[in-house]
């Protein structure tokens, strides 16, 4: 069966037709100014036109009318350096991954440009309110609690909601990571999709056979939210080896959106981690890059363990920063008053999460799930997953700061 044309295909065809028309116009008109002005808008007009085949109703062809990016469906085996969609630093998906368009790792962009700088504190306060930290400060606390109730998953939802029969969450997250990295999707997509899965499972019973469908549709929803040129529902059906049909993927998408009440933009670990990393950045670019790679590696590892659901995303981000700094400089205290001010946390506030992240890094938990570790063993990521960390953290590093010098 021929694949339906998408708008991206139509845009390419329209561009080629416009170029041919321009050449003919130039041949017949030496000045060519008027002809060029007329055909300049042709690609956009043709691409956006309503008469494109299969670009109509979603009920007949899900996603056929949306701009789509169909990665190679052969399997998630992309090597760093392989061709992929270009990701410009500072775009919606964050810094691009190594290998996207062949480029190197890009430092976390400045999240507080001149236009944003006056509002940095307000933005930070709003993000923390969304994660549930400052609900009591809301003017209408009752309404706020009702609206934000579903943004935080239940800590022990496996026992309380699922009856203990879902013990495959770690494997599901590991598989989702393989897809996101293998098909060069935005890194934000993984964090959002995992949060959708946890929130959905906190209040909806899902049997084990449909768990992969939930993860697949969560990736579909997150890719729509993050990426204008997202893969189609057909693509997400195919990556399950057609275990689930396109209609099943779309139906589960509708269930997720209905449950979330279309509140899809909750802050995740990477949201806060990028802000912390930029604010803590020094003048040595290679050191900055290595620290960022280490912290982002730890942040992805944190998704594997359901124990970390109990922590707010900003706490997990702060703990990843602590463990990342400790790993790269084990003899230097990772926390100081400046970092404490930037993150808003004392060491005692994040100690439990620090130990959890450190256990994951050391392989004391979930060492059998290799997707994330293998990804960061690559030279493109400076092999940060192979950098050893001391087995224990010095007790003095886990004490709260009392003086400027610790």
Swiss-Prot record:
Disulfide bonds, paired cysteine numbers: none
Transmembrane stretches, by residue range? none
Gene Ontology terms, MF aspect: cyclin-dependent protein serine/threonine kinase regulator activity
One GO BP: cell division
Gene Ontology CC annotation, any one: nucleus
Recorded hits in PROSITE patterns, A to Z, give: CYCLINS
Which keywords does this chain's UniProt record carry?
A: Cell cycle, Cell division, Cyclin
| One Pfam family in the UniProt entry | Cyclin_C
Region listing for Disordered, in residue ranges: 1-107
**Family per similarity comment:** Belongs to the cyclin family. Cyclin F subfamily.
Q: What is this protein called?
A: Putative cyclin-F3-2
* Naturally occurring in which organism (per UniProt): Oryza sativa subsp. japonica (Rice)
- Its gene name is CYCF3-2
